[in-house]
């Protein structure tokens, strides 16, 4: 978001959570936020969050979790905050890590009923509505590399997707959002014109954005999740926003599985 910390309405939401915790006193709490929360305002924002939780009697454990480590092809780093009033092992701070929990998930995920994909190619549909394809007018802009104030390479056809955003329906440059050429999709990644063509040549190819169905699948939801939403009257823009704001199903499942099976 705007990274304004507690100085915006969304930042104040944390104190509503604290009020709920003080009233309901749950033994376990799991919170999720962007990875930059830990460094925001030179660490003072996170220190306040930790202080408020500890004042309610919680022990607090955190790490940055990457969706790509949980059998979903999306680089999505998020801060998870686990807090509990229950006893935990003395070394639990070293146990509650992305690497450790991902290693456990790696051993068991195939029997858990979660959805898993090795590459974005596993979820890309061969045929989609033409409205998802980029217009000839907009392609050169979206394919251009970042400006002087935002230098980043605008590559398409990423086998491991960039992090989905709540504003992806606005179609940012390819250095921020995910776009795919039709020949890359049809060849299951065997043909990747990014490696051989200039940006001008790429702009001549059929290139499209993710569909809402594909966006939700990258977050670990079933293929029909967006379809059901659309059938209920939810517009594509809202579906994209929901997918971008969602937590990755597999990541949260893996954390809860680890906590429950280890009787934390």
Which residue ranges define each predicted feature?
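C-terminal target-recognition/interaction regions appended to catalytic cores
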Residues: 131-264
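Class I S-adenosyl-L-methionine
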Residues: 1-171, 181-182, 186
